[in-house]
Curated annotation (Swiss-Prot):
One of its GO terms (cellular component) is cytoplasm. Homodimer. The tRNA molecule binds across the dimer. Consists of two distinct domains, a catalytic core and a N-terminal extension that is involved in tRNA binding. This is Serine--tRNA ligase.
């Protein structure tokens, strides 16, 4: 959530952010300022009327003691009318504040000055490409064929049991999932993250705290009867762990890692891009979250990015780092990098991680603050998160990039202690 003072003092900057991100209309800023002016005028008038009412009320007792009952009754009648006006003005202020809060939640975060201005994914900047793309002397099979051949994933039965995009993992496919879970969590713990097991459902306040509401409301599954949302990412419960709290300076920085299933409706996803494990409604992910003082957040972003990239390095997967342009950023992000792995059979890049700095945007919504000194005024923290990493496309890349002429798949050495096997297929 943006600070209202920013909207009041620099509306042009906020409008530019709306245009740059392609989210909402700049007219929203004007509407918000009009409501803000109405609210402030009503507050001023309310204070004036209350002050006058208090002055008159003090006169009533004196007039009665002096036997001036008629004058006292006239003032009582007048203060009664003033009370009606006070109640009306209070309602006006409350209505304006409610509408103001509703509208300010629709304003996206302002991009950091270092973010390139652009309309869509074509304007993202490739900052680095790491690793060598595999070369084959045969036609590599896509991961969905390999998974079917080796009985690793069953999408058809998943569709029968739940619906499209809800896979079963079988045998070595299930063991590979579990191996990735432990591999990613162990690496995060070694890098100073505190492991956490978080709730898989959140309430609307938590979804609002991290910005999923109202921006991604339509992309989340919902359980209306109990007022819950199955989490679209563990960012939501982990960041809200400190919602409505004031931390001490010594408590920062905080680093958390957690594994969770995630659920996303992914409305409007069709075609070849969604085949196999490319896009699912239920998937597994390890999430990395950092909560830091404001002056440390961009150093923390670099460190978080390195944490995610190091896992890809360890898996020997070729990948590239993208700095996302304004038009391809999310609603809540001030700056974001995407990490994409190379898919050898599909011959395209697959996103496996977004690493983001939200600055104070989420902290203001969730009221996560800290004190530099015990008696100091609380200040907002900065929040960051990144996937470390999302499993499905990692599995897709591992299968496609490491397939052998005999149809088997050789797994990277870093996973062998976790899987208990080095190869899938060819009767390893």
């Amino acid at each position: 959530m943006l600070d209202l003072d920013t909207v009041r003092n620099d509306p042009r900057r906020v409008k530019e952010a709306l245009r740059a991100k392609g989210i909402g209309s700049p007219d929203l800023v004007d509407t918000l300022l009009e409501i803000d002016e109405t609210r402030r005028s009503a507050i001023t008038e309310l204070q004036d009327v209350q002050s006058r009412q208090n002055e008159l009320s003090q006169q009533i007792g004196a007039l009665k003691r002096e036997g001036k009952d008629e004058e006292a009754e006239a003032i009582i009648e007048k203060t009664g009318r003033m009370k009606e006006k006070i109640n009306r003005l209070k309602e006006e202020v409350q209505e304006a504040e409610a509408r103001q809060e509703e509208l300010v939640l629709e304003l996206p975060n302002i991009p950091h000055p270092s973010v390139p201005v652009g309309a869509d994914e074509d304007d993202n900047e490739v900052e680095a490409t790491v690793g060598e793309m595999p070369a084959f002397d045969f036609d590599p099979a896509p991961h969905w064929e390999l998974a079917d051949r080796h009985n690793l994933v069953d999408l058809e039965r998943g569709a029968k049991v739940a619906g499209s995009g809800f896979p079963f993992y079988l045998g070595k496919g299930a063991r590979l999932q579990r191996a990735l879970l432990n591999f990613f969590l162990d690496r995060a713990r070694e890098r100073g993250y505190t492991e956490m097991q978080a709730p898989l459902f959140v309430n609307p306040e938590s979804a609002k705290g991290t910005g999923q509401i109202p921006d991604k409301d339509a992309l989340m599954y919902e359980i209306p009867r109990d007022d819950f949302y199955p989490i679209p990412t563990a960012e939501v419960p982990v960041t809200n762990f400190h919602r409505d709290e004031i931390l001490a300076a010594d408590d920062l920085p905080r680093r958390y890692c957690t594994y969770s299933p995630c659920w996303r409706r992914e409305a409007g996803s069709y075609g070849s891009d969604v085949r196999g494990l490319n896009r699912l409604h239920q998937f597994d992910k390890v999430e990395l979250v950092r909560i830091v003082p404001p002056d440390e957040s961009y150093r923390a972003l670099d460190a978080l990015l390195e944490d995610a990239e190091s896992a890809l390095d360890a898996l020997d997967l070729p990948y590239r780092r993208l700095l996302m342009c304004t038009g391809d950023m999310g609603f809540t992000q001030a700056k974001v990098y995407d990490l994409e792995v190379w898919s050898a059979a599909q011959e395209r890049w697959l996103e496996v991680s977004s690493v983001s700095n939200f600055e104070a945007f989420q902290a203001r919504r969730a009221q996560i603050r800290y004190r530099l000194e015990p008696e100091a005024k609380p200040e907002l923290v900065h929040t960051l998160n990144g996937s470390g990493l999302a499993f499905p496309r990692i599995v897709a890349a591992l299968l496609e990039n490491n397939q052998q002429p005999d149809g088997s798949i050789e797994l990277p050495e870093a996973l062998h202690p976790y899987t208990g096997f080095a190869r899938i297929g060819a009767e390893a």
